[in-house]
Every structure is written in structure tokens, then in C-alpha cells.
């Protein structure tokens, strides 16, 4: 039985093993990718091009530079802020708040999986 208590739900998210936490790094794909491959969402990877859909950076687009599996957030090229000393740092954005506009198909396994799901 799964608990309905919010505190236990949060604890479950915080204590998930990394191999299960990667399932939380899923984002919606654009309409042209969805029609091409017959998928609605896919796990975000380094190299994918994404568009931010929510928040102060909404509408901005860039390539994923880094994916943090522990926090479920992405660093996107071109979306930075300045520290007090002037050095730029990435703004980490949650994977659920972006939409994938271009897939990185350099990995043969990923390409094969997408071709298999094609309708």
C-alpha cells in the first residue's frame, strides 16, 4: 500500500535510487517529433535541444549541457545568470518544464529504440 501522506511522498522522491530517479527526467517532445516517432515524451539527454516552457526563462531555447539525475534538473546552453563576482553560472531547470525540440541521435541504442517505436 502506498501512503497518501505528502511528507511520505516527498521522502519517497528524495530517497529514490538513481536508476529509478532517471524516470523523472522525462520531457514532452514537440509535435513534429511526436508525429515522426509516435512518442509523446522521452528522457532528456545531454545534447538534446530544448525550449523552456515555464518560468522566467520561458521561450528560450538551447542545447542541454548537463543533466543532474540527483536533482532532476538540466543546465541549458545560453540560460545563465551572473554571480556577484561576475562569473556566469547555469540556471538549473526542472526537466518537466521543458519541451524537446530536437533529439540527439548520436547514440545508436537511442536511435534504434526510436525507430522501433515509429508508427
Curated annotation (Swiss-Prot):
The alphabetical list of record keywords is: Ribonucleoprotein, Ribosomal protein, RNA-binding, rRNA-binding
Signal peptide interval = none
**Any one GO BP annotation for this protein:** cytoplasmic translation
GO CC annotations?
Answer: cytosolic large ribosomal subunit
A molecular-function term among this protein's GO annotations = rRNA binding
The record ties this protein, via InterPro entries, to: KOW, Rib_uL2_dom2, Ribosomal_uL24_euk/arc, Ribosomal_uL24_KOW, Translation_prot_SH3-like_sf
Coiled-coil annotation reads none
Under the heading CDD domains, the entry gives:
KOW_RPL26
Self-association and partners: Part of the 50S ribosomal subunit.
The UniProt similarity line reads: Belongs to the universal ribosomal protein uL24 family.
What is this protein identified as? Large ribosomal subunit protein uL24
Please give the organism.
Saccharolobus solfataricus (strain ATCC 35092 / DSM 1617 / JCM 11322 / P2)
Kindly list the organism's lineage: Archaea, Thermoproteota, Thermoprotei, Sulfolobales, Sulfolobaceae
Amino acid at each position: 500500500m502506498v501512503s497518501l501522506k505528502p511528507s511520505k511522498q516527498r521522502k519517497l522522491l528524495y530517497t529514490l535510487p538513481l536508476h529509478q530517479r532517471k524516470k523523472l527526467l522525462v520531457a514532452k517532445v514537440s509535435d513534429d517529433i511526436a508525429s515522426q516517432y509516435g512518442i509523446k515524451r522521452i528522457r532528456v539527454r545531454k545534447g538534446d535541444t530544448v525550449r523552456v516552457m515555464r518560468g522566467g526563462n520561458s521561450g528560450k531555447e538551447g542545447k542541454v549541457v548537463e543533466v543532474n539525475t540527483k536533482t532532476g534538473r538540466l543546465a541549458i546552453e545560453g540560460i545563465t545568470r551572473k554571480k556577484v563576482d561576475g562569473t556566469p553560472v547555469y540556471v538549473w531547470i526542472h526537466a518537466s518544464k521543458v519541451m524537446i525540440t530536437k533529439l540527439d541521435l548520436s547514440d545508436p541504442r537511442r536511435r534504434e529504440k526510436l525507430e522501433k517505436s515509429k508508427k
